[in-house]
Amino acid sequence: MAVFTSKINRKSDLFNNNKEDFTKLIKKMEDIHLRAEKVSERRRSKFIERGQLTPRERLSKLLDKDEIFIELFNMISFLVDDDNHDTSISGGSIIAGIGFVCGVRCVVFVDDSGINAGALTAKSIDKALGCLDISLKQKLPFIHLVESSGINLMNYTVEFWSNTGGMFYGLAKLSAAGIPTIAVLHGLSTAGGAYQPGMSDYVIGVKKNGMAALAGP
């Protein structure tokens, strides 16, 4: 096998200028990621009032301590629903990634109900399909923390939502392949948000808080 030796001069002006520019871009990206967390955090008082954890607190308590969590697709939806670079929120109202639960590597999918009540955007579906595909190919259990008002009907167009059924098809494929699908229903979930528990192999409902309704309460 041929050996390729780097010829980068780490002391050169070119290298250091590129490093500085790239570091600034990384900081911008991190600020965009943090924006979604800050917007969700504004609803903290409502979560406390309902006796709930915030989405990120719930995720943190689910994951094994001292194990890495690799967040996936966290730039999705940026400049899609809002074309203003300074206000657009990335992530598609979902926190998703790969982490360990009781020592088992899993795909974890969390509805961020602090953002538009967890309503799905057009790109939320793409994020879900990507996570389901990873779960199937890597044979990783799929855990969904469910609290969603379903599709955002205020921005509904057929062409954007035509692949929504792929989410349910993906869950069915995982189940058929013997890969566990687990839904934790911990809040009010309507319409599309209610299908997830119904199609999962295992459902955990939080007493007095978890509720699913196909059309409305």
Please provide the spans of the model-predicted regions.
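Intrinsically disordered, low-complexity segments enriched in small/flexible residues
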Residues: A2-C106, D112-A117
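Thiamine diphosphate
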Residues: I70, N84-I89, K123, V158-S162, ...
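Short alpha-helical segments and helix-capping/turn motifs at coil-helix boundaries
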Residues: D82-D83, G92-I95, K127-G130, M167, ...
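Short glycine-rich loop/turn motifs
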Residues: G92-A96, R105, L140-P141, F168-L171, ...
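A short, small-residue-rich loop immediately preceding and capping a beta-strand
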Residues: C106-F109, G118-L120, L140-L145, G178-S189
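Extended active-site and interfacial segments that coordinate phosphate-rich ligands
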Residues: S113-S135, D201-A212, P217
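Conserved catalytic cores of soluble enzyme domains
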Residues: V146-P217
